[in-house]
Amino acid sequence: MSFAKFSYDETTHNQVVNHPRAHENTLRGIEYLQKQGIFTSVNMVISQANFDHLYQTGVFVSNLGVESFSTAQAIPSQAGGKSHLQQALTPEQIPEYLEALHHIREDTGMFVKLTNPVPFCSVWESRPHLRYLLETSTCTAGRTIIQIDPSGQVKPCPMINNGYGNILEEGLDVVWQRMTPWSDNAYVPETCQPCDLVERCRGGCRAEAERTCGSLAAKNPFSIKPVKLSPIQEPNHNLPIGTKMVVTRNLRARKEQADLYVLFTKDRYMVTRENVARFISAIHTKGSLTIDEKLAQDRGAIETLALAYNAGILRKAA
């Protein structure tokens, strides 16, 4: 179960939620579920009201025993007017925001991810060690997710106001076909088309672009410029010699088809080939894997370990 936590600080959390006992009630709920053996995670929406609280909040919830921490930059609502726009992050804050989340992972060992996408170009070239965070979230609106309200009205995502019909009256097939522009990337900005990352990034959050720039197809305010990938990519990981890797608790595997497996546990998963699944299974059987000089020279093995680590399937031992 996921809990919303807006700050480690009781006063700030209560102010954002607008309830005098919100902090107390949230902590009580986390503690109760943990005692029942139920997995708990925390999501933090980041705005100007709590931007400086991110790192300390991550450490705070880790000390509560939370194993998974996600964040999302606040998306201004259309009803909120200028006051909501003033709470949105600035382009200059995005690198600092991602750095804080990265340090939470490095310092606590928690699995971290984004729940609102950030344009990949925002830090792809300037801070390559943050690329894994960008890849934890992309726009899935009308592609792999839809929102259905209690009356059956369908939207491509909770933050998009455009309706596409009623699933109870017309059925899923009819409504789904109306959302074809989303799967066809019709709202990906023209300025993003030359980018080598466009199929993975899709221009960032379209609701964010609409609220701040006026159109679903507008350039996201955090976009910088198209990225051109080098044929030879430099290694992008933080797994130095001496790093001890262990398999995340309660990891399970499911065979999807020949030579294709899904490794999953709690709120994370990794789709991979059989040889990688066996490699990770061997780490689990052995108990751990320590990166030595020989292994560090095996780029393929290190990249596999980095992928599994970034997906939350492996973690660094304390």
Language-model features, listed with the residues they occupy:
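Radical SAM enzyme [4Fe-4S]-AdoMet core and its adjacent flexible, acidic
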Residues: 2-151, 155-159
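Short alpha-helical segments that sit at the start of domains
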Residues: 249-277
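Long, charge-rich, low-complexity alpha-helical segments
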Residues: 268-318
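Short Fe-S-cluster ligation motifs
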Residues: 220-250
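Short cysteine/histidine-rich metal-coordination sites, predominantly Zn2+-binding motifs
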Residues: 208-225
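C-terminal accessory region of radical SAM enzymes
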Residues: 92-126, 153-203, 209-212
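N-terminal [4Fe-4S]-dependent radical SAM core
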Residues: 131, 177-180, 260, 269, ...
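Active-site lining segments that contact anionic ligands and/or coordinate catalytic metals
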Residues: 143, 149-151, 192, 202, ...
